[in-house]
């Protein structure tokens, strides 16, 4: 590098132009916030209209990217545009610090001395020392700036940056640095960078405060679009997706955003179930970075949620990006949904199992597997997943509460899955045939009832179906006993107990369901205003009881219950038929 060739002839012309920061505040603020890729986009657009400023900041970015040669090229171009450019002179002096530390330091101090009445130049010199790691010199320059302009907000931003930089960006210094950034807005409540820096430093330790700072900023200056990007991220972080979307809309209107911004904007749309917009954003990001891991992740997720025909292709692309590392349980769960949508059930459940094995304590991860099994009418598998989920919930619950009890909704659902498994198997011969090939199921049935023949279970569909049905109906019966014990005054447990007993033996004359339907009737008859569901269940109970007493030739109770049916359903054909027959018998 021929840095010394330019020597510091620059020092002969330090009567300089107006501060660059005043000419392009948003681009400069991007740079000072560490958003270098966005600052670069901004200044590349400014090269033709403002080459002095644009080349200086592009040189600054190149310097921070450890590309001294490129930085020198930019600074020289800035000087070519304006040979009296103080800021590009500062850039060249900063480069000189690497090859001639004393010469570079002297050059920077000369610039500061010559421009001591220009606080922006003084601050720029302080930043040059700071980015070169010369913190003592930077602090000295900062002290001079503070003495000369103690109410200038940029002085306090530099002070906050120095606190961080000189302490290796230690998080324990966040409060101290944040205090300096807040001083910037204290002295100038309309100074955007002060709010941005404060929000940036607090976003991980106090997201509420960070959000408030940015909301204050956009209230004062609604057109300061940089703030909306950070505000969108904070809203997303706090789960306020509607607000995040509105903020990102304004931010993206600037045309200056990164692939990571696209990913975050796509994320909040995805979690708001706005899959079309999320897909549009993902596709936009993938045009520039087709192998972006997170964008490909959301591409697959969107396909899963929207049942996109290209889901399998999207999943294949996503899982090709890394060699089985960096994937999370939800990735496999979403892949399972895609396989499920493609009716590749065995593969789907294998992926659900993989997802669960990666994060077994995440009780929510079982939900899609349970739903998928029910959709396939594989209630046995649904019950298996649900039972494991209940056990995990109990394990977590007891860790915090020794008196933890299983959720009533879960008990009901598990009982119903058992009931459905037992009552529907006779209507699912393909599923029965599949189960018969599973030795673990054969062994389970034989162990539960030693009188059963394992050979018959494995070869005779009717024999297997009957044994399988009884096994799960008895499990359902036990679950509904638990439900009744927990909530005896609810009709639900009694009703399901009635259904289960009837499924075990549907001979109404035996009346296995009778006492349970009688209990249903007693409970619902006490309800002042019946819902449509209440009326339907009560009608179900009266129908069963009316038919039971009819089969028992109990005329009084037959008339009683079929009469109750007509009170609920005046046009009920069965009730009319039975009651008419009773009247005719009495003639």
Question: For the regions a protein language model found, what residue spans apply to each?
Answer:
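Alpha-solenoid helical repeat scaffolds
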Residues: 5, 20-550, 577-586
């Amino acid at each position: 590098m021929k840095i010394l060739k330019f020597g510091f002839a620059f020092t002969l012309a330090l009567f300089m132009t107006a501060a660059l920061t005043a000419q392009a505040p948003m681009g400069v603020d991007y740079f000072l916030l560490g958003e270098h890729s966005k600052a670069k986009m901004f200044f590349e657009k400014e090269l033709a209209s403002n080459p002095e400023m644009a080349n200086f900041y592009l040189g600054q970015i190149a310097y921070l990217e450890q590309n001294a040669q490129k930085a020198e090229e930019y600074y020289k171009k800035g000087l070519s545009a304006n040979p009296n450019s103080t800021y590009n002179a500062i850039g060249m002096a900063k480069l000189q610090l690497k090859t001639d530390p004393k010469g570079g330091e002297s050059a920077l101090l000369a610039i500061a001395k010559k421009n001591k009445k220009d606080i922006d130049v003084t601050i720029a010199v302080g930043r040059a020392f700071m980015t070169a790691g010369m913190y003592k010199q930077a602090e000295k320059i900062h002290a001079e700036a503070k003495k000369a302009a103690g109410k200038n907000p940029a002085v306090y931003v530099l002070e906050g940056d120095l606190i961080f930089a000189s302490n290796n960006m230690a998080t324990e210094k966040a409060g101290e640095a944040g205090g300096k950034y807040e001083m910037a807005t204290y002295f100038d409540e309309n100074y955007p960078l002060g709010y941005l820096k404060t929000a940036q430093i607090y976003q991980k330790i106090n997201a509420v405060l960070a959000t408030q700072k940015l909301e204050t900023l956009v209230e004062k200056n609604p057109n300061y679009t940089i703030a909306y990007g950070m505000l969108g991220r904070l809203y997303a972080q706090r789960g306020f997706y509607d607000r995040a979307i509105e903020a990102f809309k304004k931010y993206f209107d600037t045309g200056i955003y990164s692939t990571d911004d696209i990913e975050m904007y796509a994320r909040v749309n995805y979690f708001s179930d706005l899959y079309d917009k999320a897909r549009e954003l993902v596709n936009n990001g993938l045009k520039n970075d087709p192998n972006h891991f997170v964008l490909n992740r959301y591409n697959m997720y969107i396909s899963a949620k929207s049942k996109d025909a290209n889901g399998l292709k999207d999943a294949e692309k996503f899982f090709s990006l890394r060699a089985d590392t960096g994937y999370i349980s939800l990735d496999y769960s979403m892949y399972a949904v895609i396989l499920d949508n493609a009716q590749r059930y065995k593969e789907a459940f294998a992926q659900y199992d993989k997802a669960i094995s990666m994060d077994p304590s995440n009780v929510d991860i079982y939900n899609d597997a349970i739903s998928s099994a029910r959709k396939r009418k594989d209630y046995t598998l649904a019950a298996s997943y649900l039972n494991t989920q209940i056990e995990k919930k109990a394990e977590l619950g007891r860790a915090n509460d020794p008196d933890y009890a299983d959720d009533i909704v879960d008990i009901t659902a598990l009982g119903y899955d058992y009931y459905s498994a037992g009552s529907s198997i006779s209507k699912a011969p393909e599923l029965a045939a599949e189960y018969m090939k599973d030795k673990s199921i054969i062994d389970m049935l034989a162990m539960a009832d030693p009188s059963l023949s394992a050979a018959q279970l494995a070869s005779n569909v009717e024999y297997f179906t009957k044994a399988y049905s009884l096994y799960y109906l008895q499990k359902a019966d036990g679950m509904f006993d638990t439900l009744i014990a927990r909530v005896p005054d609810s009709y639900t447990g009694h009703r399901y107990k009635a259904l289960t007993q009837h499924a075990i033996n549907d001979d109404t004359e035996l009346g296995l369901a009778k006492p349970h339907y009688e209990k249903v009737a007693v409970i619902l008859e006490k309800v002042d205003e019946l819902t449509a569901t209440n009326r339907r269940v009560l009608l179900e109970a009266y129908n069963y009881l009316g038919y039971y007493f009819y089969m028992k030739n109990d005329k009084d109770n037959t008339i009683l219950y079929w009469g109750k049916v007509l009170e609920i359903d005046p046009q009920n054909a069965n009730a009319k038929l039975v009651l008419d027959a009773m009247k005719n018998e009495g003639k």
